[in-house]
Amino acid sequence: MAKVSIYLNFPGNAEEAFNHYKSVFKTEFAMPVMRMKDAPPRPGMPPMSEKDANAVMHASLPILGGTLIMASDMLESMGHKTVVGNNTTISLEPDTREETDRLFRALSEGGSEIAPMSDEFWGYWGCCLDRFGIRWMFNFPKEMN
């Protein structure tokens, strides 16, 4: 079944924020928190500091009515700067890869591709900015692929 989630980016304090949200909503993480060090190494990628390696790559927490909030740390040391505008993203998980591509193309039109759709270790993923300045993330998980 297709899903919509809210994706939040933090400048290095995602875990602190999500532990707070966990206590507010009285829920548990939907899956174990993934760390930057959990990602397979990419060719040419420099080694990470211990602090960066332990930063949050992905966390997800159910809040109300089955809605998930998800998050990651966008670290300046990795070329990111978290500012109002790139700290919140609408995350779509369509039912098919074809629908994922269709939505990505339609929402990118007149806007820009932040990360083109590509096969990643967790699934088929991409991100765009629509012509109104809204960030959209697309994920078609590997188990559905």
Residue ranges of each PLM-predicted region?
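Vicinal oxygen chelate
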Residues: 2, 31-34, 60-63, 69-82, ...
